[in-house]
UniProtKB/Swiss-Prot annotation:
It comes from the Eukaryota. This is Sex-lethal homolog. Expressed in somatic cells of both sexes throughout development, but not in the pole cells which are the progenitors of the germline. CDD domains: RRM2_Hu_like (cd12376).
Length: 324
């Protein structure tokens, strides 16, 4: 117990993130919507080269192991994806910006998944430069998506073919190329509620498709029954198209629905979720401190007490001079 040598454990940045800055603002500045890893599909952007800082395989421990439960994951046949976003090099939606052929974004991660598990899952597909699950640096709350940067484009392409669509702890993973950030793809993801509980992908496309090119759409479904929950995410190719859809459909009852839709940016929905989560943990914004009283206040109180004693008339029965 006492007297034993205790190893000094210092903080190590996550895999490949020597220059990682613990800043909440860094998260909110990213063009994808925060933090809705439970539902939202983040495919809009990834951290730039200065944030990724790849070090190569020399700086990593191999967590996969021969006996890992995920050791043969890349030999599994992926389920057929129902997502409209192609996982090819176009980055989805015909965006003119080039994509990084080695950097992937992984969506719909289990809430309790760790960096080690994610690394073991993708390491079987090839050497990895960087691998990180995006989390709130204060609470550790997982946003449900991650970036994985492979050493070669062939390994990244293999990871998309083999891991995309598989189920991990009741979560169906979505793996695709991460698109570089830019002003043209910010604020393009919409969060839609009050949809009919019988809505299909084609009906969702019919409602929103008239306002622009839909890059991706995802109807959230009940885990047990598989029926729609009345909630969906719709990502447009341009910000202007998303804003037009908000103006045209928010608080409007579409054909076949019984209540008006709520359409807003997914980023706003993510911030509301994060604020609610922080309040549940008792980590909301601190109350404003009570200002300390200055010396002038103390002097005023002291003078008031002196004047009160000076003008106070003592009752005759309580006057000690009467009994002398």
């Amino acid at each position: 117990m006492y007297g034993q040598n205790v190893r000094n454990v210092s903080y190590y940045p996550p895999y490949g993130y020597n220059g990682y800055k613990q800043s909440g603002e860094r998260m909110w500045r990213m063009s994808h919507s925060l933090p809705s890893g439970m539902d939202t599909d983040f495919t809009s952007s990834y951290p730039g080269p200065s944030a990724m800082n790849p070090r190569g395989r020399g700086g990593y421990n191999d967590f996969s192991g021969g006996g890992s439960a995920m050791g043969s994951m890349c030999n599994m046949a992926p389920a057929q994806s129902t997502n409209s976003l192609n996982s090819g090099g176009d980055g989805g939606g015909g965006d003119t910006q080039a994509v990084n052929g080695t950097n992937l974004i992984v969506n719909y991660l289990p809430q309790d998944m760790t960096d080690r598990e994610l690394y073991a899952l993708f390491r079987t597909c090839g050497p990895i430069n960087t691998c990180r699950i995006m989390k709130d640096y204060k609470t550790g709350y997982s946003f449900g998506y991650a970036f994985v940067d492979f050493a070669s484009e062939i390994d990244a392409q293999n990871a998309i073919k083999t891991v995309n669509g598989i189920t991990v702890r009741n979560k169906r993973l979505k793996v695709s190329y991460a698109r570089p950030g830019g002003e043209s793809i910010k604020d393009t993801n919409l969060y839609v509620t009050n949809l009919p509980r019988t809505i299909t992908d084609d009906e969702l496309e019919k409602i929103f498709g008239k306002y622009g090119n839909i890059v991706q759409k995802n109807i959230l479904r009940d885990k047990l029954t598989g029926r729609p929950r009345g909630v969906a995410f719709v990502r447009f190719n341009k910000r202007e198209e998303a804003q037009e859809a908000i103006s045209a459909l928010n608080n409007v009852i579409p054909e076949g629905a019984s209540q008006p839709l709520t359409v807003r940016l997914a980023e706003e929905h993510g911030k509301m979720k994060a604020h609610h989560f922080m309040n549940q943990l008792g980590m909301g914004p601190p109350a404003a401190p009570i200002p300390a009283a200055g010396p002038g206040y103390n002097n005023m109180v002291h003078r008031g007490r002196q004047n009160k004693m000076r003008n106070h008339k003592v009752h005759p029965y309580h006057n000690p001079q009467k009994f002398i």
